[in-house]
């Protein structure tokens, strides 16, 4: 593993956590690494900003570790939020991705909004992050069209599943939006819903993982349940996935 990745792991004190920022070489590097190593790459995408995608990406790495899955995360968002929050800068994208492949089962890729088509095409699976609100409901059709076009031109045929974040069951609008999305997208909406919890927001702003600062919180329970539902890992039957 390269020295700067080792330094990052020490800085975060989280075994198996690595954030890297890389540029144009990323899609080809991901493809070559997948072919050689069997790494499962997962793009976290959203059509609209502000849905909590980056915070989920960071904290899902720890949730996977709790399940025994060796996970890492990289940042391809032009805004570089993940990199800015957790502080790593890549020197050699191709070398970095290959090092991660040797030591990880799952690689989460944090993207921008709207997501870049190259990441959509090269991922093994896509997690579409959405909030239960009018903006996300209105964007369902547009995102679905984008996903269909992606599958048509991608040899990997990535499966897309929808993750609902920041849900508050006390709000009627949230309940109605969730019901509408499940009607439109079922069974592709994940059963696990990440409930709204201030602990996640506060931990992210503090550049910490929520498992460390609020281990008994609702959002930690939701993230752990999400990791169990997704169940990615080396040897998973990702080539048999169908919509």
Residue locations for each model-derived region?
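Conserved Switch II/interswitch segment of TRAFAC-class P-loop GTPases
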Residues: 123-144, 168-170, 174
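Conserved C-terminal guanine-recognition region of P-loop GTPase G domains, centered on the G4
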Residues: 140-156, 165
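Walker A/P-loop
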Residues: 54
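Well-ordered beta-strand positions
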Residues: 106, 124-128, 161, 187
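NTP-binding/hydrolysis catalytic cores, primarily Walker-type P-loop NTPases
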Residues: 210-243
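Beta-strand-loop-alpha "switch" segments that mediate conformational coupling across diverse proteins
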Residues: 166-173, 178-211, 223
């Amino acid at each position: 593993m390269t020295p700067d990745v080792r330094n990052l792991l020490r800085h975060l004190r989280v075994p198996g956590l690595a954030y890297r920022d890389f540029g144009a070489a990323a899609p080809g590097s991901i493809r070559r690494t997948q072919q050689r190593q069997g790494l499962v790459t997962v793009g976290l995408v959203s059509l609209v900003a502000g849905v909590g995608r980056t915070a989920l990406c960071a904290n899902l790495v720890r949730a996977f570790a709790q399940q025994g899955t060796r996970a890492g995360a990289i940042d391809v968002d032009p805004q570089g939020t993940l990199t800015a929050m957790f502080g790593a800068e890549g020197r050699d994208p191709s070398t970095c991705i290959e090092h991660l492949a040797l030591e990880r089962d799952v690689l989460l890729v944090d993207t921008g909004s709207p997501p870049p088509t190259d990441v959509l095409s090269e991922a093994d699976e896509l997690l579409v992050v959405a909030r239960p609100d009018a903006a996300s409901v209105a964007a369902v059709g547009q995102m679905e069209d984008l996903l269909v076009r992606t599958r048509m031109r991608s040899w990997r045929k990535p499966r897309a599943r929808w993750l609902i974040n920041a849900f508050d069951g006390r709000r009627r609008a949230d309940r109605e939006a969730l019901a509408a999305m499940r009607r439109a997208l079922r069974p592709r909406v994940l059963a696990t819903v990440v409930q709204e919890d201030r602990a996640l927001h506060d931990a992210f702003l503090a550049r910490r993982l929520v498992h460390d600062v609020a281990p008994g919180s609702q959002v930690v329970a939701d993230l752990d349940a999400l990791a169990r539902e997704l169940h990615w890992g080396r040897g998973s039957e990702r080539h048999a996935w169908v919509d």
